[in-house]
Amino acid sequence: MVALADYPQIAAGKVRQLHAVDDEHLLLVASDRISAFDHVLSTPIPDKGRVLTAMSVFWFNLLSDVVPNHLVAWDDPRIPAEVRGRALLVRRLEMLQVECVARGYLTGSGLLDYQRTGAVCGVVLPEGLTEASRLPEPIFTPATKAELGAHDENVSFEAVAEAVGQELAAELRELTLRVYGRAAEHARERGVILADTKFEFGVAGGGALVLGDEVLTPDSSRYWPADGYEPGKVQPSFDKQYVRNWLTSAESGWDRASDTPPPPLPDDVVAATRARYVEAYERITGLDLADWPSPAA
């Protein structure tokens, strides 16, 4: 029986690690780790790795008629039993060093850019927009892929074109917005707003663009409950915002500006964060996380 130790680890991020399987395949393993403010917290969130993996599989399958993806299998003899349910067997790709972000609503770093300049990544927006405003149409707001521990930096479309070429940049923009549009439509049908999301693309043999990494998970996307949507204020969300809020509260006792690592998360914050991740999966997919993984998934 194969073990994870049989596969050399070739990369590790805050949440995932990548192992070499053979010349054509990699094993992408999601952990229960959670990061905030560029720190990996010492307290894991139970089942988070399963949610990220199951949700990626759901979206890869749903979007397969829109864009090819790197998923080979989620249930395969080459996947060690110790990571089954939170690991994907994927194709090797030549990944592009561009974070392809689509935004349908104004929040986060996009809102900060807009407040400073009236634009996001060079895309000029109407006056009078506020927190959580729905944009007239979704926009492509790319970012550079930062090294571990550093911040991604929002850049203009022109900067992407300079880095990868005008034709490929235009293809990335068109594909990003097309995938976002399909995903946002599905989420809306499930009573959820997909405010924004990040995609990563790679190039396969022949030069075709392929969707890689994770896709449309609570770690890479902002999901809001549609029934409580109210522009002008911060929206409740199905992601790690609850953790961020606790870390910046007086209760945590942590000074974000200090060099000290964040404190361990209390049990109630862990439970509430887990519940948000699980709810995101179950609302979006209509499936029960308790059934993942199963041969019928």
Swiss-Prot record:
Class of enzymatic activity (EC top level): ligase
SUPFAM superfamilies noted in UniProt: SAICAR synthase-like
EC number: 6.3.2.6
Pathway(s) per entry: Purine metabolism; IMP biosynthesis via de novo pathway; 5-amino-1-(5-phospho-D-ribosyl)imidazole-4-carboxamide from 5-amino-1-(5-phospho-D-ribosyl)imidazole-4-carboxylate: step 1/2
GO annotation, biological process: 'de novo' IMP biosynthetic process
PROSITE patterns: SAICAR_SYNTHETASE_2
Keyword field: ATP-binding, Ligase, Nucleotide-binding, Purine biosynthesis
Coiled coil: none
Family affiliation: Belongs to the SAICAR synthetase family.
PANTHER family xrefs: PHOSPHORIBOSYLAMINOIMIDAZOLE-SUCCINOCARBOXAMIDE SYNTHASE (PTHR43700:SF1)
Record-given protein name: Phosphoribosylaminoimidazole-succinocarboxamide synthase
Species in which this protein is naturally found: Saccharopolyspora erythraea (strain ATCC 11635 / DSM 40517 / JCM 4748 / NBRC 13426 / NCIMB 8594 / NRRL 2338)
